[in-house]
């Protein structure tokens, strides 16, 4: 749809979305704003007035990703999972040492363990299992500030794999090809928070044949295997549910973002953090009245997202962010600025229909890109975001609920069945090299918690 005005600035374009039938022509608006100094302010006020019509009641509809209408599929009866009973030093001892592991954005590894333990897909008979799960917590070694230290993780994971391969026959039967592991850190099984170091390390060699469940997703990247299942990061469902605005709350913010633009502690010279995308957002739009952006994280953060049309989701050190989850939950259209990102449950969730993708190099014209999206497309994205199945698929609630992210993980595993017969090895055959990897990763790991 063509806009009725060829506007020279972003504020004018933004207004073109929300001009409903009560507005009699764009000439009136153009004549209203004569003084250039008042132009942005007046147009922003008009924008706030007209945007209230966008929050009208919307109907729900079925959602289809590339795998079809699968968000509401029930995985029970489609797969069986055997959980290895391994020593607590690999999992719950970490939690006893630091319960903050249950509240950070990597907490899915703990919660998935609990979920599978009680799930009807669990089998106690490994001979009938389709999948084998090793509950290793690789993001629960925290700094005083609550950030995970992944540097021990390769040794912890190697130790756990050595344990299951020496106590059960199933790992050696396939070299782990029918096993899955949860690796929710920034760059997953590359086990480093800086991309350059993660690429240098690569995926832990012993996991080459296993299926990885990870938050990191980027095409053509050494830290993502083709058969990995990309999941959303953990965001506390209860906290978000208690902060919901009334449905009639108008969306009076055009574009919203809270977070770092620079990371002087880890990137003192600038330009490396977020590949410069966040810095470009700040430098180009810090004074633009359409953009509500700041490093300050207000107490009303969740409420503010519910008043925004667009929520910016730029990459940080890694391409993924909890803002993706928050945007979907709060009906704020995610603006995804992360080249080649692979999004959570991409075969089930139609991200192209609910979000806006902006290449990192195009950040300086972000205002123009957003303002050329027509009114009908905005409404359609909001209509899809309003679907309860969409929101449920992004959350890890306790107790679990049908269609939630736990069930989407199981659905993803079920869609990989049956296993190809070629994964089963001949006696004495193996594709793994237990001495491969950085020398520091090969040191034994024991009870050094």
Swiss-Prot record:
It comes from the Eukaryota. It is a single-pass type II membrane protein. The keyword Translocase does not apply. Signal peptide: none annotated. It is found in: Golgi apparatus membrane. Disulfide bonds: none annotated. Residues 1-31 are cytoplasmic. Involved in the synthesis of glucuronoxylan hemicellulose in secondary cell walls. GO terms for cellular component: Golgi membrane. Disruption phenotype: No visible phenotype and no significant change in monosaccharide composition of the cell walls. It comes from Physcomitrium patens (Spreading-leaved earth moss). One of its GO terms (biological process) is protein glycosylation. Residues 53-449 are lumenal. Glycans are attached at residues 172, 433. GO terms for molecular function: glucuronoxylan glucuronosyltransferase activity. Its main location: Golgi. Mostly expressed in newly formed or expanding tissues. InterPro entries: Exostosin (IPR004263), Exostosin_GT47 (IPR040911). Pfam families: Exostosin_GT47. This is Probable glucuronosyltransferase 47 A. The keyword ATP-binding does not apply. The chain crosses the membrane at residues 32-52.
